[in-house]
Amino acid sequence: MQFIQEKAIGSWVEMDTVIGTPGGKVILTVDFTFCNFMAAFLLDSKACANVSNVFAGIKRKFRENDMRFGDIIPLILTDNGNEFSDVNAIELDLDGAKETSVFFCRPMRPSDKPHVEKNHTLFRDICPKGTSFDNFTQDDVNLIFSHVNSIVRNSLGGKSPYDLFSFTYGKKQLPCLASKRYRAGKLAKVHYC
């Protein structure tokens, strides 16, 4: 927290993975704490290279849209799982300059990243624990998390995470994070969960 105060960082992201079935596909989740907007990426496994590839792809998309990754994601808080062990792949931009900072939670302390853990419960309302992600596509994951991001929340003053994220950063960033807005009446249980 000292780093956050010293650098005057107003917002950071919490990162985690959601397990489907043991040995199967997993979902990498990135939660923007100020509004609980969550980006999610389907991975073939918890291998570190898969996480590195996702971050390289996000950074490319931001650059193609004349945006700087570190302006949107200045700090990442995550656990010390092996999938997050290539810190350089996460922290450095495509040219090798440091663009963000990664910090690790204390072992066995999910309370250190409460926002991402809370949003996982909303995901589990759609896809209960034990659901296999092996037949999911990235489009399926985008749809599910677009639904999660469209839920209006009292804690956000009657707004959705999508609304606050797009108000803060503009809608230009949303395609980089593969999210769409759904009206509350259109939220429905996804058929494959």
Q: Which role does the model predict for each range below?
A:
Residues 23-25, 33-38:
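Coil-to-beta-strand transition motifs
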Residues 129-193:
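C-terminal domain-tail junction helix/linker
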Residues 36-41, 104, 129:
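Short small-residue beta-strand/loop micro-motif enriched in glycine and branched aliphatics
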Residues 78-80, 87-93, 102-126, 134-146:
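RNase H-like two-metal-ion nuclease catalytic core shared by retroviral integrases
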